[in-house]
């Protein structure tokens, strides 16, 4: 009977260690799994387990590699790792030493993003010809975003500063996570169905690709494409571009920029009105000058073509003919006596024609003067009428006539239904503002 050779635990462990570390298949291993038992050691090293439904393996990542990660690992994260298998001799346990780790799923999201982008581009959803124009003077702006956070506050502040005449309608939604996609689609449909909004602002703050993913969903892209109301998107930061940004009618880099793109600047409008008044005055003066020059030119042409000028020419011809006739009379007095008498009767009495020509000249002169006066009066009236209309649009001139602007919480009050007893209101006059409190209200039945 042969005597058995017994190995020490150390020898067996060393043998297994050599086998593991010399196996080419284990020198570079690619694993995917879920992080559990995560510890971020004070030294900077990471210790955790990678598990799936049926097994788990210990894992570690030295500080040198951990410092290059683009995210902060935590328990529950699904990751893709690259590393090698090693054995801890003192405990006889093996583990994976990791030198590369990324979140699982981002690669799939980017792939899906590109597939959807190409599909919608081929369908023509991103064509510039389909972009609806943004109205210059919106009365109602529908804002689809979270009812909390900085986005809605930035939009409200910007619109209140630039264009108080616009009414803001907030439609709160879930901007990420489960149910957010359906919430966005339903809200877009609701605004198109129920609201009288002139433009929609669809926005949310920044975040990772997973946070913004609802705005890359095909259903959301289709809902924006089908909107009858123009849509301005302000999603994420300036460097983030979602499929919703591609299909929207206008993309803004920030919520503040979206509010600016949706509204005119009141100060710019007032300046534009003043500039147009000055331009209208200039063109009116130029037209009056042109019409005056035209009338003077016509007057000169009429004078040159007048009967008086023709008579002067005929007189010269008569004088010339008389000289010829005198000479002819001396040579052939007997033969042409009757003819000379007849010509004398016709040529020596032009008074009646001259009188008729004078009357025609006076009539034409009167008509020209009347036409000139009518043209000048008409252009002056049109100019004054345009000036009054433009001045009537100036809010300051409206206030100078006794009108005022009433607001509650920076919103313009246009109806008694917008206020209640004990509300505090701000009233702006031409030379200042007053804060008042509503003691009672009485509606006017129309």
From Swiss-Prot:
Lineage of the organism: Bacteria, Bacillati, Mycoplasmatota, Mollicutes, Acholeplasmatales
EC number: 3.1.11.6
Pfam families from the UniProt entry: Exonuc_VII_L (PF02601), tRNA_anti_2 (PF13742)
Source species: Acholeplasma laidlawii (strain PG-8A)
HAMAP family: Exonuc_7_L
Domain of life: Bacteria
Name of the top EC class for this enzyme: hydrolase
Principal localisation: cytoplasm
Protein known as: Exodeoxyribonuclease 7 large subunit
Subunit details: Heterooligomer composed of large and small subunits.
InterPro entries in the cross-refs: Exonuc_VII_L (IPR003753), Exonuc_VII_lsu_C (IPR020579), OB-fold_nuc-bd_dom (IPR025824)
Catalysis: reaction(s): Exonucleolytic cleavage in either 5'- to 3'- or 3'- to 5'-direction to yield nucleoside 5'-phosphates
CC terms in the record's Gene Ontology section: cytoplasm; exodeoxyribonuclease VII complex
Localization per Swiss-Prot or TrEMBL: Cytoplasm
Keyword Nuclease attributed: yes
Family: Belongs to the XseA family.
GO MF, any single term: exodeoxyribonuclease VII activity
Job of this protein: Bidirectionally degrades single-stranded DNA into large acid-insoluble oligonucleotides, which are then degraded further into small acid-soluble oligonucleotides.
Gene Ontology biological-process annotations: DNA catabolic process
UniProt keywords, alphabetically: Cytoplasm, Exonuclease, Hydrolase, Nuclease
């Amino acid at each position: 009977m042969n005597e058995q050779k017994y190995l020490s635990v150390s020898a067996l462990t060393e043998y297994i260690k050599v086998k593991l570390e010399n196996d080419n298949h284990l020198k570079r291993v690619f694993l995917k799994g879920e992080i559990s038992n995560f510890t971020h050691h004070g030294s900077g090293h990471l210790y955790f387990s990678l598990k799936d439904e049926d097994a788990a393996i210990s894992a570690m990542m030295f500080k040198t590699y951990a410092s290059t990660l683009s995210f902060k690992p935590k328990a529950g994260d699904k990751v893709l790792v690259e590393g090698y298998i090693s054995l801890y001799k003192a405990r006889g346990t093996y583990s994976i030493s990791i030198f590369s780790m990324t979140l699982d799923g981002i690669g799939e999201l980017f792939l899906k993003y590109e597939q959807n982008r190409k599909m919608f581009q081929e369908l023509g959803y991103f064509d510039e010809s389909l972009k609806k124009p943004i109205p210059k003077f919106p009365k109602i702006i529908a804002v689809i975003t979270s009812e909390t956070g900085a986005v809605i506050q930035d939009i409200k502040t910007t619109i209140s500063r630039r264009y108080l005449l616009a009414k803001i309608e907030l439609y709160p939604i879930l901007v990420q996570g489960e149910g957010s996609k359906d919430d966005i689609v339903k809200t877009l449909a609701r605004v198109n169905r129920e609201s009288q909004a002139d433009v929609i602002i669809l926005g949310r703050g920044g975040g990772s690709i997973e946070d913004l993913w609802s705005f890359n969903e095909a259903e959301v892209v289709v809902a924006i494409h089908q909107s009858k109301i123009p849509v301005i998107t302000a999603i994420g930061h300036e460097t983030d571009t979602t499929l919703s940004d591609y299909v929207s009618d206008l993309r803004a880099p920030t919520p503040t920029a979206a509010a600016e793109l949706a509204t005119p600047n009141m100060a710019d409008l007032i300046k534009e009105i003043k500039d147009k008044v000055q331009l209208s005055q200039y063109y009116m003066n130029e037209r009056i000058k042109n019409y005056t020059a035209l009338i003077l030119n016509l007057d000169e042409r009429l004078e040159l073509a007048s009967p008086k000028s023709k008579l002067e020419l005929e007189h010269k011809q008569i004088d010339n003919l008389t000289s010829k006739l005198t000479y002819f009379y001396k040579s052939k007095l007997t033969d042409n006596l009757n003819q000379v008498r007849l010509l004398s009767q016709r040529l020596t009495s032009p008074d009646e024609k001259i009188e008729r020509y004078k009357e025609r000249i006076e009539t034409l002169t009167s008509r020209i003067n009347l036409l000139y006066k009518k043209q000048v009066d008409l252009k002056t009236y049109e100019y004054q009428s345009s000036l009054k209309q433009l001045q009537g649009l100036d809010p300051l001139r409206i206030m100078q006539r006794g009108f005022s602007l009433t607001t509650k919480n920076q919103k313009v009050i246009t109806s008694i239904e917008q206020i209640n007893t004990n509300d505090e209101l701000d009233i702006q006059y031409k030379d200042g503002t007053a804060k008042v409190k509503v003691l009672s209200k009485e509606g006017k039945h129309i």
